[in-house]
Curated annotation (Swiss-Prot):
Boundaries of every B30.2/SPRY domain copy: 61-253
InterPro entries to which the protein is assigned, alphabetical: B30.2/SPRY, B30.2/SPRY_sf, ConA-like_dom_sf, F-box-like_dom_sf, F-box_dom, FBXO45-Fsn/SPSB_families, SPRY_dom, SPRY_FBXO45
Keywords attached to this entry: Neurogenesis, Synapse, Ubl conjugation pathway
Protein name, entry field: F-box/SPRY domain-containing protein 1
GO CC terms, sorted: cell cortex; neuromuscular junction; nucleus; pole plasm; SCF ubiquitin ligase complex
Main location: other
SUPFAM superfamilies, A to Z: Concanavalin A-like lectins/glucanases, F-box domain
Organism whose genome encodes this protein: Drosophila erecta (Fruit fly)
Lineage: Eukaryota, Metazoa, Ecdysozoa, Arthropoda, Hexapoda
Length: 255
């Protein structure tokens, strides 16, 4: 009978205690009893606010980059899903805001980066915002850990092997295993990507599909038959000093 004990705990006391716990411990605490579950289920509570303000870079909190994640808890989750500084080309670095990659101006090189967390189960969506010039090739999509993150020349690195799947925003082509898989989206005179637009990437690990959405318009399924492997948000770029941000949103909303 934990509930009666929990009920005796002052709200402020719980708030202080939970503020000092690690995020993994908070997840365990939410399973202790209904009172603690409801307490932590408030994604804008002072507990999540405290963790958000103490873990997220101030640069990210001050910008409108996280406008699509409205609560402290979802902002925190997005941060832990952002680009990995340890899983990117040597010509790429992650900016102080934690969400934006910067490609250094290295000649005759194509460079890629993966997110910190990959997915093998469930449905997931994230936003990609290309905040600099696209250059001759700019690809967004997914890859396994086996996919290369750097190569010589200016090429569509993402989608160049059997471990990656990508959409080249410059030519509106789908790429996988080194082959052009068709035009995308399947529209007559499909508009080209404009720098700064937010594209939502939708990975469905249950149906094994990858889809995209732009300006809240579903563009259709891009890839089917994805493998039963852990798949990571990935981009590859060729333009010097270009920047790309990625914000994890969670489970996609149907409709």
């Amino acid at each position: 009978m934990v509930d009666p004990v929990a009920a005796l705990c002052n709200y402020n006391v719980l708030e202080v205690i939970f503020s000092y716990l690690e995020l993994e411990d908070l997840s365990h605490c939410s399973q202790v009893c209904k009172s603690w579950y409801h307490f932590l289920n408030d994604e804008n509570s002072d507990v999540w606010r405290w963790h958000c303000l103490n873990k997220l870079p101030k640069e990210a909190l001050k910008s409108d980059l996280l406008s699509s994640v409205s609560t402290y808890k979802t902002k925190l989750r997005a941060y832990f899903h952002a680009w990995s500084p340890n899983d990117c080309s040597r010509n790429v670095y992650i900016k102080p805001n934690g969400f934006t990659l910067h490609r250094n101006p290295v000649a005759q090189s194509t460079d890629a980066a993966r997110g910190k967390i990959g997915f093998r189960h469930g449905r997931h969506t994230w936003e990609v915002i290309w905040e600099g010039p696209l250059g001759t090739v700019a690809v967004i999509g997914i890859s396994t850990k086996e996919a290369a993150l750097q190569c010589h020349g200016y090429v569509a690195l993402l989608g160049s092997d059997d471990q990656s799947w990508g959409w080249n925003l410059v030519e509106n082509h789908l790429l996988h295993n080194g082959d052009m898989q068709g035009s995308y989206p399947l529209l007559n005179n499909a508009p080209k990507y404009q720098v700064g637009e937010r594209i939502r990437v939708i990975l469905d690990c249950e149906d094994n599909t990858l889809s995209f959405e732009k300006n809240y318009e579903f563009l259709g399924v891009a890839f089917r038959g994805l493998p039963d492997k852990k798949l990571y948000p990935t981009v590859s770029a060729v333009y010097g000093n270009t920047e790309v941000s990625m914000v994890y949103l969670g489970t996609p909303l149907d409709g």
